[in-house]
Amino acid sequence: MGVFLIAAGFPGRDAGEVLRDTVEAIAVAEEAGFDDAWIAEHHFMSYGVCPSAATLAGVALGRTSRIGVGTAVSVLSTRHPVDLAEQAAILDRVSGGRFTLGVGRGGPWVDLEVFGTGLERFERGFGESLDLLCAALDAGTVSAEGEFFRFRPVPVVPPARLRPVVACTSAPTVALAAERGLPMLLGMHIGDAERAAMIRSYRTASEGAGGERRGGRDGGLGNGDGDPGEGRDVGPGGGGRDGGAGGDADPGHVGAAVGYVADTTERAVRELREAMPRWLAPGLAGHVPVDGRPGPRRDIGAYVDFLCDTHPVGSPGRCAERIARTAGATGLRHLILMVEGAGDHARTLDNIRRLGEQVLPLVRDL
């Protein structure tokens, strides 16, 4: 069981303060008994104010000693895969294997213009980028002769054997992950039925590929393949550990969910209904398409109601019941809980501590 930190930019919050608070939340999650913590990545918007999940993961790894830390996700469409592999290798080696790299395709946002990677690579190049990333994480040397990357063989220094997790919100990306034997990161924007269907599709695609495994070492663990938080397909064990997914030979899939505990379910739902729209409305509006297409739209109130009804939001007993229900319906045994929903840092830390004390003991044996 882990925590998922979007570094949410609630109105009035300073971005630097939010980032410092995110690192503190991970340290508190370690004290509370969580297995891992996952950090989101966004550019040029208040939805999430961390532009480099891997960089902040390095800070968090330096502040902790046991907890695994992962990216949910590093956006591969705006990064050179070998550069990201080198950064992941540093974090893996220096942390003693506590880092897990989660990657995603991202969305058709203005990021593609700013970083110069372009819409064509976003639309056609994710598979090539992912294969190059996996090669750099699983070999002493790496080279490329593809549509988007071409370079001579070079040594990978430091070498590392890592298997990334792939954020999946679409059937093609589910198939892509399955064919490579890479675990999926499933977003909190879908319910148990959709997650179960995606896991079934993954198994079918994996069997069709002959069980081929092109990733690195087993285990570990999330944009859509978009962000595991808001999960638009327009477009989180710590490092190297088995994620503990249920079912037959599922390779450590991870599911993101909202996690918020209060004395009563009514109070928990009321607090999130009051707080989350203040963040989600301007945050989701910050997604600016690079090519002038209409931006994403969502009924914010209905979305918050869905999150509260679907995920571990409520009394300790209800939170445990929702976690157990998801495990039974999907086979997922590794959930990462978005704990920032109240928009208040002190409440976030209290939420993490209460989840660790009052909920985790009820679900450890699932």
Predicted feature residues:
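Internal, glycine-rich beta/alpha segment that forms the wall or movable "lid"
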Residues: H80-P183, M188, D192-R200, R213, ...
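Conserved, mostly hydrophobic/aromatic
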Residues: A29, G33, E41, A60, ...
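N-terminal beta1-alpha1-beta2 module of alpha/beta enzyme domains
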Residues: M1-G68, L162
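An alpha-helical appendage that flanks or caps ligand/catalytic pockets
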Residues: E120-V154, A193-G216, G244-R333, R364-L366
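Acidic (Asp/Glu)-rich catalytic clusters
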Residues: E30-E31, A57-S65, A88-R98, A178-E179, ...
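Alpha-helix-loop-beta-strand connector modules within alpha/beta enzyme cores
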Residues: C50-V73, G125, R353-L366
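Hydrophobic faces of well-ordered beta-strands that scaffold small-molecule active sites
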Residues: M1-L5, A37-I39, V69-T71, F99-V103, ...
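Active-site mouth loops of central-metabolism enzymes
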Residues: L5-R20, S74-V82, P158-C168, F306-P316
